[in-house]
Structures are given as C-alpha cells and as structure tokens.
A protein has these predicted regions:
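Long, hydrophobic/aromatic-enriched structural stretches that serve as scaffold segments
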Residues: 1-4
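Aromatic/basic-lined ligand-recognition segments
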Residues: 32-172
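Short amphipathic alpha-helical segments
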Residues: 6-17, 104-111
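Acidic, low-complexity cytosolic segments
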Residues: 11-30
Length: 172
C-alpha cells in the first residue's frame, strides 16, 4: 500500500505504475475490492497529458476505478440495481439505487461519483435518513438496505439512494 496514508494518493501511485507498465505489455488494472477494472493504457502519461497526477487526483471519476460502479439484475425483482463498491477504502459509504433499467447507468454513476467526491474532499459524512440535493429540484434520500435486500451487503456501509423531488423532502 505504500507509505502515504491517503487512499487516494495510494491509488494515484498505482495508476501511474499501471500506466508505465502498459508500455511493457500490461493489459489491465484490476481493483478487486471495487469490483472493476480498466485497460492499463488509460493511465499512460501520453493519454493523461502533462498534468496527469492532478487529473488522477481531482478529475478522474472515482467510480471508474477507485470505487467501482456495478449494475446487476436480481431474480424476481424488476429493474436494475446500481451500486458502488470499494468506497470503504476511503472511509466512505457505498451507495446503491434501484433503477428502472440499464439506461439510467450514467445518471447514477454521475450522482454517486459527485457525492463520493464531495464527501472525500469536504470530510462531510452521510448516513441513513440524510438528504442531499443532486439536481436543480432533485434530492437523494438515504436509507439502510432492507432485510430482504441482502444482495446490497458488503464489507462496509451501503446506503440506498432514493431520488425524490424538492416538494417531497419535507413530506417524509
């Protein structure tokens, strides 16, 4: 894990090494705890440019490699579950949402990435019962997974995101 205490700095260092190894034939970077992988060539300095470290620290979506974003269907449940894995490495909760279909993947990936980035940079904490504005009139309300949502269990805390409109915030 290296000597830096920041998980983000550790991941940035690993990404830089992966980029260097890609010129020697490395094919992919795997983040097992985040349930994700990316082609090693994504991290080549030529691909990222002269500000590669800043890009990896500040501009690279956390849900691309550092905290994975996974979509899956659960038997006998309509729709698609979308969730993050690996946020516990940063001391953050993972997020999950029950979407209508795979077409909502980018929306939820963006929401999760933005919220995780905010939590990481601000030091703020979120828990079940909290709400947060994620769009002009859209808020996310957080809850713990229900007992029958066993498939959302993970090594750390997972919070279920329910998107609500502004007028629903005070109705609950």
């Amino acid at each position: 894990k290296g000597y830096d205490t920041s998980p983000l700095e550790q991941y940035v260092a690993l990404a830089v090494v992966a980029g260097a190894l890609s010129s020697m034939g490395a094919v992919a970077v795997l983040n097992e705890s985040a349930h994700t992988s990316l082609p090693a060539g994504v991290f080549k300095s030529q691909e990222l440019g002269k500000h590669s470290l800043e890009i990896l620290r500040e501009g690279f979506p956390l849900t691309s490699l550092f905290c994975g974003f996974v979509k899956y269907e659960v038997e006998d449940i309509e729709g698609v579950w979308m969730r993050t894995y690996g946020a516990d490495c940063f001391g953050l909760p993972d997020f999950a949402a029950h979407a209508q279909g795979h077409h909502e993947g980018q929306k939820y990936s963006d929401i999760f990435n933005n919220v995780l980035r905010y939590l990481l940079e601000s030091g703020a904490e979120m828990a079940a019962g909290h709400t947060m504005q994620v769009g002009k009139t859209t808020f996310m309300k957080l809850r713990d997974p229900l007992d029958d949502e066993y498939y959302l269990q993970g090594p750390g805390t997972t919070l279920v995101v329910e998107l609500i409109e502004e007028d629903e915030c005070n109705a609950h």
